[in-house]
Amino acid sequence: MAMASLAISVLAFIVSAATLWLSHLYRGKLQMTRPTVVFFGPDGGASGNPKIYLRTLIYATARRGIVLENLYVRLRRGETQQNFNIWVYGERDLARGSGLFIGQEGIATNHHFLTPNDVNGFDFAAGEYKLDVFGKIVGRNRVSLLSSIDLKIDAQEAEKLRQPDHGIYFDWGPDAARYQTKIEARRASPMDQLKLLETLRDGATDPTAQPIS
């Protein structure tokens, strides 16, 4: 009887310790689902700055959640690579990325990434691409690689992308288990660029903004 009581007490202690660790001590990881859609092309408006857009669910494996400090993408093609480090996110209301709390349930939203101001353009030429998504977590020195996505643009698609206002969509096809491409001309309204610039300048939500994907 005494041994049974001791075993129950030890088991209860282990369960309590595990619960404490999972709830308060375990820092967990930041993860993301495979993006359902990825876009390469102009951001809309007169300047036509290169942009990468994707939609995904970002979530934390820890119960206490994680604070995401920054998110950016790196696009590689052969020996060429370019960081798209200006991060804007949201559905109808766009906000400049400047910290976001991510819980276990995650946040599914649109993410827009633009090149730095000192980059005049980026040629989405034909070739095989690798799109890496990185997240910087508050309190951790290293950035985390959240996803690495393989994409391809053929010669015919690259030629179309050189036309003004044209972009390429990569839509995930679950049956084919690969991304399917679609070229579209994007006729953005003159206000789109202004709204995006206001969001980048103020670092706050623009309540009148519309999706720029």
What kind of feature is each model-predicted range?
Residues 84-126, 134, 138-141:
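Extended, solvent-exposed segments with strong compositional bias
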Residues 22-48:
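Low-complexity, acidic Ser/Thr/Pro/Gly-rich terminal tails and inter-domain linkers that flank the onset
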Residues 150-213:
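Acidic, serine/threonine- and proline-rich intrinsically disordered appendage/tail regions
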